[in-house]
UniProtKB/Swiss-Prot annotation:
<keyword id="KW-0378">Hydrolase</keyword>
<feature type="binding site" description="via carbamate group">
    <location>
        <position position="146"/>
    </location>
    <ligand>
        <name>Zn(2+) 2</name>
    </ligand>
</feature>
<feature type="modified residue" description="N6-carboxylysine">
    <location>
        <position position="146"/>
    </location>
</feature>
<dbReference type="GO" id="GO:0005737">
    <property type="term" value="C:cytoplasm"/>
</dbReference>
<dbReference type="Pfam" id="PF01979">
    <property type="entry name" value="Amidohydro_1"/>
</dbReference>
<dbReference type="GO" id="GO:0008270">
    <property type="term" value="F:zinc ion binding"/>
</dbReference>
<dbReference type="GO" id="GO:0050897">
    <property type="term" value="F:cobalt ion binding"/>
</dbReference>
<feature type="binding site">
    <location>
        <position position="59"/>
    </location>
    <ligand>
        <name>Zn(2+) 1</name>
    </ligand>
</feature>
<comment type="similarity">
    <text>Belongs to the metallo-dependent hydrolases superfamily. Allantoinase family.</text>
</comment>
<feature type="binding site">
    <location>
        <position position="61"/>
    </location>
    <ligand>
        <name>Zn(2+) 1</name>
    </ligand>
</feature>
<dbReference type="InterPro" id="IPR006680">
    <property type="entry name" value="Amidohydro-rel"/>
</dbReference>
<dbReference type="GO" id="GO:0000256">
    <property type="term" value="P:allantoin catabolic process"/>
</dbReference>
<keyword id="KW-0479">Metal-binding</keyword>
<feature type="binding site" description="via carbamate group">
    <location>
        <position position="146"/>
    </location>
    <ligand>
        <name>Zn(2+) 1</name>
    </ligand>
</feature>
<keyword id="KW-0659">Purine metabolism</keyword>
<dbReference type="GO" id="GO:0004038">
    <property type="term" value="F:allantoinase activity"/>
</dbReference>
<feature type="binding site">
    <location>
        <position position="315"/>
    </location>
    <ligand>
        <name>Zn(2+) 1</name>
    </ligand>
</feature>
Length: 453
């Protein structure tokens, strides 16, 4: 049999091992994995490279439509491809209108036409004003529902995203449980964080350390405990977003050990940046929950290696530069990190700390695909989509602004020496990014709907 493509001589990350083996691709799918595969229209030599499943980034903000001047599908998904991401799961905010019903999700689909360099799945929003319309999003095919128990949204904009109170969360989770959906939650105590932040501003405490102190670990832990209990009472699967503290992870682990259906994610910035670096970098490293101190970071690495964190995500949430102006307490909170999840974490986790390649593959791709029901994604195995990434290990470069594909070429990682490089990204059998030739094919990404899985 002649295949469309054979990838030869790479160290391939399989689910439970990594070894030098060939991959054959036919019709956009992985057709065979074995030694000495022959006869293909095209052959790629991956000698000396790691061949990983394409990253499934389960937490991405592309602010189109309505705030395309923050980030758009064209720039955002090009950055994703350059960073080794082949599937993103997009959040129902920061776009306007927020994605909270059938009409608003159709606006998203229309806005993305012809612009997706990678594949995308969509989350719906659970907000204070759409409890009677959640079913519309489920029927369209979202793979989960995001909500905030921290304060969220611009109160001056009618169709912006909104946080939920405990009653709204409980009722929404009940409905989502009946739909066999997952609720994803941003967990920080709204009132305490808001009041601590206002208090700091009044007293002129506006440094990075002051911002971190205004969103202490206990505000994350309390919110995680609360939503765990309410989701359990409501009968709904729970996914805790961007955990920043080992104490927060421990709450999820405890609930899981007691039999609750709960998963969690974290982000590269909580593992590679600390509060002192945040102070040096400035507002580009502001996010919530905040980047914490070195002792906290050490605990997060332990939780990651223990297998207590299910997946790593970018939480890519950029904005125009003017929204990062001023002091840290005033600036927009969000990090542009989409393009540098895989290379940074390969360097820090695999090369510097000895993480196994199969564990890396699970954290970057497999587990997220499983959590959100993306049955064709996340694994290098026969029958799966041929979504693959070539990583060149032990290949250092210094990230520059001009390397970035974002609408606004800024990132807290600019100036960082990264010890690995993404050299090629393949989506359903086609090379969509190559380090030497850029983006060789027109955008071919498509939306993945739950009911099509």
């Amino acid at each position: 049999m002649s295949f469309d493509l054979i990838i030869k001589n790479g160290t391939v990350i399989l689910e439970n091992e990594a070894r030098v083996i060939d991959i054959a691709v036919q019709g956009g799918k992985i057709a065979a994995i074995g030694e000495n595969l022959e006869e293909a229209k095209n052959v790629l030599d991956a000698t000396g490279l790691i061949v990983s499943p394409g990253m499934v980034d389960a937490h991405t903000h592309i602010s189109e439509p309505g705030r395309t001047h923050w980030e758009g599908y064209e720039t955002g998904t090009r950055a994703a491809a350059k960073g080794g991401i082949t599937t993103m799961i997009e959040m129902p905010l920061n776009q306007l209108p927020a994605t909270v019903d059938r009409e608003t999700i159709e606006l998203k689909f229309d806005a993305a036409k012809g612009k997706l360099t990678i594949d995308a799945a969509q989350l719906g929003g659970l907000v204070s004003y759409n409890l009677d319309r959640l079913h519309e999003l489920d029927e369209v095919g979202v793979v989960g529902f995001k909500c905030f128990v921290a304060t969220c949204g611009d109160r001056g904009i009618d169709n912006d995203f909104r946080d939920v109170n405990d009653w709204q969360f409980y009722k929404g989770a009940q409905k989502l449980g009946e739909m066999d959906q997952t609720v994803l939650v941003h967990c920080e105590n709204a009132l305490i964080c808001d009041e601590l932040g206002e208090e700091a501003k009044r007293e002129g405490r506006v440094t990075a350390h002051d911002y971190v102190a205004s969103r202490p670990v206990f505000t994350e832990v309390e919110a995680i405990r609360r939503v765990l209990y309410l989701a359990k009472a409501a009968g709904c699967r729970l996914h805790v977003c961007h955990i920043s503290s080992p104490e927060g992870v421990e709450e999820v682990t405890r609930a899981r050990q007691e039999g609750q259906d709960v998963t969690c994610e974290s982000c590269p910035h909580y593992f590679v940046l600390d509060t002192d670096q945040f102070e040096e970098i400035g507002t580009l490293a502001k996010c919530s929950p905040p980047i914490r101190d070195q002792e906290n970071q050490k605990g997060m690495w332990e939780k990651l290696f223990n297998g207590e964190i299910d997946c790593l995500v970018s939480d890519h949430s950029p904005c125009p530069p003017e929204m990062k102006a001023g002091n840290i307490m005033q600036a927009w909170g969000g990090i542009a990190g989409l393009q540098n999840c895989m290379d940074v974490m390969f360097d820090e986790a695999v090369q510097k700390r000895g993480m196994s390649l199969p564990m890396f593959g699970k954290l970057m791709a497999t587990n997220a695909a499983d959590i959100f029901g993306l049955k064709h994604k996340g694994r290098i195995a026969p029958g799966k989509d041929a979504d693959l990434v070539f990583i060149q290990p032990d290949s250092s470069y210094v990230l520059k602004n001009e390397d970035l594909e974002y609408r606004h070429k800024v990132s807290p990682y600019v100036g960082r020496t990264i010890g690995a490089r993404i050299t090629k990204t393949i989506l359903r059998g086609d090379v969509i990014y190559d380090i030497e030739h850029g983006f060789p094919v027109p955008p071919k990404g498509q939306f993945i709907l739950k009911h099509q899985q």
